[in-house]
Amino acid sequence: MSKYIKIRNAVKKYGDQTIISNLSLDIKEGEFFTLLGPSGCGKTTLLRMIAGFNSIEGGDFYFGETRINDIDPAKRNIGMVFQNYAIFPNMNVEKNVAFGLKNRKLPKDEIKSKTDEFLKLMKIDEYRDRMPERLSGGQQQRVALARALAITPDVLLMDEPLCNLDAKLRVEMRNVIKQIQNNVGITTVYVTHDQEEAMAVSDRIAVMNHGDIQQIGTPKVLYQRPTNLFVATFIGHTNVLDGKLCIKNNKAYLQLAGGYEVLVDSIKEDELKDQVVKASIRPEELIVKKDNGDGLKAI
């Protein structure tokens, strides 16, 4: 059964260096949740703390109501998919998928039934007798995902699983992963630095930088309503303009270089004050017209 994840005041240190400081996070049951950010932002470190592969210097981690800080990784009932696939080279596809089931000493008929189920679900049934060296990268990733799901984990953790695939195969596999996650309904935590990938597969995304969560939201919210300049420039493409916010008769106006002024009706009430600002304008919001019309003259 899938479980929600709750993290409160997490701290991770390597020696005297603090990587993650006082981080709190809630991931809903059955949600596809992505940790997104540049290299070194702490996203994989946080994932490994959830998995139990990294020590926890502070804070509390929960699967449902169960605190997991001191639970051995093997007993957390997680499925893990790594960026290098980590399938066993000395086992064929069927034995790789069945590995976790055999480790749990399940009855032989149940092992056979669940192995067959996930071979078919991942569309690798025809490769059941094939060795890993005879599989493509995409096929190996399907095997890794089938093996992770076959044990019926409470949580599925995925650490940049598509980074070693070519561009075309990445698009194909991200669609497969999202479809399978929807079908199975398992709580999934996905790590990537690729914002396009994150936007395509996620229910919600946490944008991270320097060990802190900058913003959590749906892909649409992050794109249209970024909470700060980092999120605005990291998600998609944007044009950043310097300006001033001026309040006149309780209305907000954005003043730009050249004396242009625009009425802005989306400013939060607690931000209605004169201040220096940066305006983020997405490319698709710009309209090129032959004749003059409403808006700002760009050229």
Tell me the role of every PLM-derived stretch.
Residues A51:
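Helix-to-loop junction immediately C-terminal to a conserved catalytic motif
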